């Protein structure tokens, strides 16, 4: 329900702010499950992903790395939002390999807010969905 979603978003925002001292400025719905009511209620830009590494499923650093590298090798990574989950240790291992590899191969890593400005030429808008 929308009430449950609002409670979950509020609790998450509070936890993030308590942990790092800054409130979230963007919102990624769990599992990508959202609708217009939730998007409006979140009062943040809604960020979806364009590359799913399936890291949550494989829990394998090399497979996660290979997934992103394959997209890059196919020329399908520029300007994309890569979904990875920080709760899995192998994802951290993949990230340690990916960041240097991406930089060595000419990629610039930016926040999703910066990406929206580059791709859309606008500041991220609350309630608007971005891929």
Briefly describe each language-model feature range.
Residues 27, 32-33, 103, 127:
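A generic alpha-helix propensity feature with a strong bias for hydrophobic helices
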Residues 26, 61-64, 81-89, 116-124:
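Low-complexity, flexible helical/coil segments
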Residues 18-24, 105-109:
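Surface-exposed helix-capping loop/turn segments at secondary-structure junctions
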């Amino acid at each position: 329900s929308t009430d449950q979603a609002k409670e979950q978003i509020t609790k998450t925002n509070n936890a993030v702010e308590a942990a790092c001292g800054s409130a979230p400025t963007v919102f990624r719905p769990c599992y990508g499950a959202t609708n217009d009511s939730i998007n409006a209620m979140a009062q943040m830009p809604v960020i979806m992903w364009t590359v799913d590494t399936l890291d949550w499923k494989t829990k394998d650093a090399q497979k996660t790395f290979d997934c992103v590298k394959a997209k890059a090798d196919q020329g399908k990574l520029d300007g994309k939002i890569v979904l990875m989950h920080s709760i899995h240790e192998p994802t951290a291992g993949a990230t340690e390999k990916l960041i240097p590899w991406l930089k060595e191969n000419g990629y610039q890593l930016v926040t999703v807010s910066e990406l929206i400005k580059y791709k859309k030429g606008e500041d991220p808008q609350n309630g608007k969905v971005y891929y």
